């Protein structure tokens, strides 16, 4: 494996050099990995004999790195003992290893030829802005900010940007002006390029140039020319000018606005242009803006914080396939946001359904800020999906995104010959257009997926209600069976004792009414028709889940995008001399991509309409299930009440029967002091209301029977008379409690 120059064979012990990460003016940065511990560090070593001045600068970088501690500045660490030796008479510099490569590598990807995504731009703005602010607070000017000196690291699934290579950094604690070293020319502030005195505002120019390139895909001022050339043409630009390009006539066109295409949403474009006007001011004294007296920091950092703190909700209108963005003021209610959506889309608030990516409906009780995730920025990172509940048929596809002027020019005449240098710009926009068509489909597919997840949530709720309904129906059925059997038995026993015991027409009528009600409630518990509808919906949903249109269908579009990227790569590798070429192959790809998007969107919206139709069936069915469940619960409650009421009546009858028994005992005790007892008849033994007096033991019972055998006939006569008298008294009792 390759060793960095000067590193002797066998040196490093358990540390093994894995790859060369980069090469600078006189230094190499290599990745070292511990063979046993799986630790990784970046080692910067000198590859040349250094002059005294450069050796001092090398050592100065190490001193600066060791005293810095910030999340967006790469950290220095101790050189492992096995590697701690001099190379070319200077020490090594050990740093944390960032595995994501540098920003230049990201910008060079063909898919980023027209700039990065909004989320990436805002992440870079936040990270590098924070790192620069930290360096300046510590009186350090970097002086060589460029994409090659910004590295990326994955931290818990989030990409962090870190500033590296402080070899040209200047510690200005001895004074505010420096006239020493000149860094990379393309990103260099004008005063450094002209070797004039400078301040920390040189980093503003470099930072602004980098951010502009991340937005547009190229540097702001005549990016195809060498700095010596474009400086002379740009130096007298208006302070608000942030972009300059050369027309076919050779005339330079200036603009205070960002060029198109780019990925920024409309709400961010203006504040970003204002920020770039501060950062790209040619005058170093005006660059960055005045210091805010309250916040005690330059205007550029105040505006940067404002941009990063904007709460913007991005909503994909699934009825039109268009994205609408809203700036959320503090504490705005969801209803207020929906009113703004109505004005923008014409969908009234009552018909709006806003779904998260997980298919969860937004909570109207919570503020509108629930549409924005903490720490997540950019319309490419998080979207809310708008549906019109009054519609179940979506008529897509809709018109494809519009072509830029350049792309439209070659589409109208694909055989027109253009210079290679101009064709690169046109084809870059063509790649951006093809990628945009694929992304438009991906967003709509994500909206369809949110609708599917919402449908499944409704289906889960319906299933729970179905299970509750079936359980309640089964319980009602069991209770009705018990009630029916028990009331039949009670009516039979009541009929048996009527001729010799207690009777009440009111009570008998009430019991028979209960029996009729129970028969009616049995019909309430019949839910088979609802079960059939629910099972039919379950089957329909399963078919929708299995449908190929429920899965991403953009394979052909991805293939076409890759073909466009490959064509663009080939063009970039061609020499930019005076040769010309046409755009026939690129235009074919554009046309095929539009046709492919049209086809997959027809399939997508057809499937989406089925999803929404199925969901509407569930919405229509849920009230019926709720009503059936409510009726069953009401019937259940009524049956239990009737059962309890009848049991109270039976106990009341038992109380009356006991009163009769007590009366018989009193009559018997008045007959010459003798209280003979007769064995109960079979009828009395079986009747639950018979008052049975039980002797204390068997011997006493036998004695009592023997003593009273002689009085049996006389006692029977007395009891018969007492029964007749008591029967007459029953008619005068208060039976009003039966109607309670």
UniProtKB/Swiss-Prot annotation:
Enzyme class label: transferase
UniProt region (Leucine-zipper), positions on chain: 455-476
Name of this protein: Inhibitor of nuclear factor kappa-B kinase subunit alpha
Example of a GO biological process term: positive regulation of gene expression
Modified residues (Phosphoserine): 176, 180
Pfam families noted in UniProt: IKBKB_SDD, IKKbetaNEMObind, Pkinase
Protein source organism: Bos taurus (Bovine)
Modulation of this protein's activity: Activated when phosphorylated and inactivated when dephosphorylated.
Function: Serine kinase that plays an essential role in the NF-kappa-B signaling pathway which is activated by multiple stimuli such as inflammatory cytokines, bacterial or viral products, DNA damages or other cellular stresses. Acts as a part of the canonical IKK complex in the conventional pathway of NF-kappa-B activation and phosphorylates inhibitors of NF-kappa-B on serine residues. These modifications allow polyubiquitination of the inhibitors and subsequent degradation by the proteasome.
Leader sequence segment: none
């Amino acid at each position: 494996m390759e060793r960095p120059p000067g590193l002797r064979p066998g040196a490093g012990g358990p540390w093994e050099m894995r790859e060369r990460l980069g090469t600078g003016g006189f230094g190499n940065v290599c990745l070292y990995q511990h063979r046993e511990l799986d630790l990784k560090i970046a080692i910067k070593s000198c590859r040349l004999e250094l002059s005294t001045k450069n050796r001092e600068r090398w050592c100065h970088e190490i001193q600066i790195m060791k005293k810095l501690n910030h999340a967006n500045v790469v950290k220095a660490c101790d050189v492992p003992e096995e590697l701690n030796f001099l190379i070319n008479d200077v020490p090594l510099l050990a740093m944390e290893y960032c595995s994501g490569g540098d920003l230049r590598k990201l910008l060079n990807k063909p898919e980023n030829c027209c700039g990065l995504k909004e989320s990436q731009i805002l992440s870079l703005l936040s990270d590098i802005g924070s790192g620069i602010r930290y360096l300046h607070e510590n009186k350090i000017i970097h002086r060589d900010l460029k994409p090659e000196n910004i590295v990326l690291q994955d931290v818990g699934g989030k990409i962090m940007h870190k500033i590296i290579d402080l070899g040209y950094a200047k510690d200005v604690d001895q004074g505010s002006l420096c006239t020493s070293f000149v860094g990379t020319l393309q990103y260099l502030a004008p005063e450094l390029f002209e070797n004039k005195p400078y301040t920390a505002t040189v980093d503003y120019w470099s930072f602004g140039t980098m951010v502009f390139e991340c937005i547009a895909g190229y540097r702001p001022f005549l990016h195809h020319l060498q700095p010596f050339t474009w400086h002379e043409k740009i130096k007298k630009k208006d302070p608000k000018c942030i972009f300059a390009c050369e027309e076919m006539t050779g005339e330079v066109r200036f603009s205070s606005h960002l060029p198109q295409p780019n990925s920024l949403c409309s709400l961010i474009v203006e504040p970003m242009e204002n920020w770039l006007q501060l950062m790209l001011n040619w005058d170093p004294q005006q660059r960055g803006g005045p210091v805010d007296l309250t916040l005690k920091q330059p205007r550029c950092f105040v505006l940067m914080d404002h941009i990063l703190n904007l709460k913007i909700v991005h909503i994909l209108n699934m009825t039109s396939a268009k994205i609408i963005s809203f700036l959320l003021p503090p504490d705005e209610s969801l209803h207020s946001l929906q009113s703004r959506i109505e004005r923008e889309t014409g969908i009234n608030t009552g018909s709006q359904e806003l779904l998260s990516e997980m298919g969860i409906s937004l909570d109207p009780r919570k503020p509108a800020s629930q549409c924005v995730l903490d720490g997540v920025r950019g319309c490419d990172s998080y979207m809310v999906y708008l549906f019109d509940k009054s519609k179940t048929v979506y008529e897509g596809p809709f018109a494809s995104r519009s072509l830029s002027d350049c792309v439209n020019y070659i589409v109208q005449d694909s055989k027109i010959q253009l210079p290679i240098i101009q064709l690169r710009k046109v084809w870059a926009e063509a790649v951006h257009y093809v990628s945009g068509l694929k992304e438009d489909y991906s967003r709509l597919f994500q909206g369809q997926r949110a609708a599917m997840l919402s449908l499944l949530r409704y289906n889960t709720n319906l299933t729970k209600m179905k299970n509750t309904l079936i359980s309640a129906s089964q319980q009602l059925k069991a209770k009705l069976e018990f009630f029916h059997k028990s009331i039949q038995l009670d009516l039979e026993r009541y009929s048996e004792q009527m001729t010799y015991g207690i009777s009440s027409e009111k009570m008998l009528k009430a019991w028979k009414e209960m029996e009729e009600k129970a028969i009616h409630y049995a019909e309430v518990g019949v839910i088979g028709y609802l079960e059939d509808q629910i099972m039919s919906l379950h089957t329909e949903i399963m078919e929708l889940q299995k449908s190929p249109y429920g899965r991403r269908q953009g394979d052909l579009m991805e293939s076409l995008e890759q073909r466009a990227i490959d064509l663009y790569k080939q063009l970039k590798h061609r020499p930019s001399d005076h040769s010309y070429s046409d755009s026939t192959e690129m235009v074919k790809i554009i046309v095929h991509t539009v046709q492919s998007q049209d086809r997959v969107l027809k399939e997508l919206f057809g499937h989406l309409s089925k999803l929404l139709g199925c969901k509407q069936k569930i919405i229509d069915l849920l009230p019926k299930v709720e009503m059936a469940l409510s009726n069953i619960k009401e019937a259940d409650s009524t049956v239990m009440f009737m059962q309890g009421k009848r049991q109270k009546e039976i106990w009341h009858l038992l109380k009356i029967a006991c009163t009769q028994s007590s009366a018989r005992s009193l009559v018997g005790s008045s007959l010459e002091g003798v209280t003979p007892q007769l064995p109960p008849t079979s009828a009395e033994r079986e009747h639950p209301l018979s008052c049975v007096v039980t002797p204390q033991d068997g011997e006493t019972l036998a004695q009592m029977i023997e003593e009273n055998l002689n009085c049996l006939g006389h006692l029977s006569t007395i009891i018969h008379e007492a029964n007749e008298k008591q029967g007459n008294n029953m008619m005068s009792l208060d039976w009003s409690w039966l109607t309670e």
